[in-house]
């Protein structure tokens, strides 16, 4: 592989469930590496596990990728649609002697492994049907279909320079002759992956370190095919805040749980980018910056820790930066589910502009914004406490001011201060009952901003109920 070889990366999930956080990070790093070099990002669906693969899982993976904006350049390619190609390669390997038929039954193989375990040996296929010079093979059993095994080298080592973990060496004696086609002819995982990586000219395989043990097997198959080897990089796992492997008990692990919980895709991408990669002290950056900066040299070897509070902080940053009209489109359906009344109500983007500074999620923003979209129901005891006889004359004067004041925050603020000065009141003495009357709540943004957004007609009507 030369410096001029076009970079080709791939994301190759098995559709046996949702797109999880670890898979999304793998996809992001593979996508970013291709983008950094102007290369090609391939999406491949490894669906040969017929018992566990489902169309629903395929759709969930594609939806997760689309939500994150990780658009593939080629694919999606489905392994189940490449069966003719796999059969062709298996036939070539059988003809070349790099694969062979094995007629050992599953019961015989299991008994073989039990004997090896009892002897303290590593369980492995013993090569009964492996052709060797001068070796006489057993008679072929009647009515038994064979599997096809890869003829793994018996001597030497498999060594590769992992871009994350450094040099890794596995002795071929640790590897047995892998089944590459089952009795029904369907090819197996490691074989399909090797053929696909070769056919698709993948130059860099970035994946989780749970695949490290697959790598020497795939390398040996690729060598047997005379294929060029890709570079491999195995990412350490993602841990929960407690140091255990990230799982459902830590909260959401499916990527598509996050939009439902009110996270923006750009926040999720930014957060995932920092799970196992760094660029100095930069915490917040755009995907354009990320793809410009991203390289494999700064991937960390130690497991990354998923910190929900850090994700909340980043999400808050992006909510504050986001266009209010876009946010309105995202939270309006949530608010409708909460019973929001939008007729004769304040402009939602304007409300969002007032409320979004401190919220961590869109769900929180939707709940907070409901202040402006439901009928107030102030607590009677709080009204008695705050709407006192001493305050009512000031409230009446404020109403008169509201009837004629120029409707804007500055003018409303000046009018309120004039009333306070006239009646020798402090701001909370009038602002608290106003908040209760107008919104039903004691905690709101500044009363001037609240009054401005509700508008003259609504504010006067609500105050009139209490004078």
Curated annotation (Swiss-Prot):
Placement of sequence motif 'HIGH' region: 13-23
Location, primary (coarse class): cytoplasm
Residues reported to bind ATP: 248
Enzyme class, broadest EC rank: ligase
Localization terms from the record: Cytoplasm
Catalytic activity: tRNA(Glu) + L-glutamate + ATP = L-glutamyl-tRNA(Glu) + AMP + diphosphate
Keyword Transcription regulation attributed: no
GO biological process: glutamyl-tRNA aminoacylation
EC numbers, comma separated: 6.1.1.17
Gene3D superfamilies: 1.10.10.350, HUPs
Keywords on record: Aminoacyl-tRNA synthetase, ATP-binding, Cytoplasm, Ligase, Nucleotide-binding, Protein biosynthesis
One GO CC annotation: cytosol
Record's keyword annotation contains Cytoplasm: yes
Matching SUPFAM superfamilies: An anticodon-binding domain of class I aminoacyl-tRNA synthetases, Nucleotidylyl transferase
Position of sequence motif 'KMSKS' region: 245-249
A GO molecular function held by the record: zinc ion binding
Function: Catalyzes the attachment of glutamate to tRNA(Glu) in a two-step reaction: glutamate is first activated by ATP to form Glu-AMP and then transferred to the acceptor end of tRNA(Glu).
Matching HAMAP family: Glu_tRNA_synth_type1 (MF_00022)
NCBIfam families: gltX_bact
Assembly information from the UniProt record: Monomer.
Name the record gives this protein: Glutamate--tRNA ligase
Taxonomic source organism: Herminiimonas arsenicoxydans
């Amino acid at each position: 592989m030369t410096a001029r070889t076009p970079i080709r990366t791939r994301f190759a999930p098995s559709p046996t469930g949702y797109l999880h956080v670890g898979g999304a990070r793998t996809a992001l790093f593979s996508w970013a590496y291709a983008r950094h070099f102007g290369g090609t990002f391939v999406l491949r669906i490894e669906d040969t596990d017929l018992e566990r693969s489902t169309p629903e899982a395929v759709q969930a993976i594609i939806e997760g990728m689309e939500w994150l904006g990780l658009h593939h350049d080629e694919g999606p390619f489905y392994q189940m649609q490449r069966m003719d190609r796999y059969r062709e390669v298996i036939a070539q390997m059988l003809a070349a002697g790099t694969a062979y038929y094995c007629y050992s039954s599953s019961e015989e193989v299991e008994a073989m492994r039990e004997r090896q375990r009892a002897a303290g040996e590593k369980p492995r296929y013993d090569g009964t049907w492996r052709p060797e010079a001068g070796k006489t093979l057993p008679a072929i059993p009647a009515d038994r279909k064979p599997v096809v095994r890869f003829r793994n080298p018996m001597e030497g080592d498999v060594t590769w320079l992992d871009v994350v973990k450094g040099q890794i060496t596995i002795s071929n004696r640790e590897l047995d002759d892998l089944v590459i086609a089952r009795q029904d002819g369907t090819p197996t995982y490691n074989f399909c992956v090797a053929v696909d990586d070769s056919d698709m000219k993948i130059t860099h395989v970035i994946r989780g370190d749970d695949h490290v043990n697959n790598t020497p097997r795939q390398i040996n198959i690729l060598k047997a095919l005379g294929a060029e080897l890709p570079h491999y990089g195995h990412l350490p796992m993602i841990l929960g805040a407690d140091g255990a492997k990230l799982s459902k008990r830590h909260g959401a692990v499916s990527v598509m749980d996050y939009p439902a919980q009110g996270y923006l895709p750009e926040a999720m991408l930014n957060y995932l980018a920092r799970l196992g990669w760094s660029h100095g002290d930069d915490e917040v950056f755009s995907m354009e910056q990320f793809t410009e900066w991203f390289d494999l040299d700064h991937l960390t070897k130690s497991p990354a820790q998923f910190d929900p509070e850090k994700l909340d902080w980043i999400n808050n940053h992006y909510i504050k930066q986001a266009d209010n009209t876009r946010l309105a489109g995202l939270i309006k359906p949530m608010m409708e589910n909460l019973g929001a009344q939008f007729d004769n109500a304040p402009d939602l983007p304007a409300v969002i502009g007032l409320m979004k500074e401190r919220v961590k999620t869109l769900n929180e923003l939707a709940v907070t914004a409901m202040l402006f979209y439901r009928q107030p129901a102030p607590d009677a005891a709080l009204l008695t406490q705050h709407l006192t006889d001493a305050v009512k004359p000031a409230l009446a004067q404020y109403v008169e001011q509201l009837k004629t004041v120029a409707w804007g925050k500055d003018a409303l603020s000046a009018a309120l201060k004039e009333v306070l000065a006239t009646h020798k009141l402090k701001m909370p003495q009038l602002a608290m009952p106003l908040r209760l009357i107008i919104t039903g709540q004691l905690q709101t943004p500044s009363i001037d901003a609240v009054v401005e957004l509700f508008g003259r007609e609504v504010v006067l009507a609500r105050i009139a109920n209490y004078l």
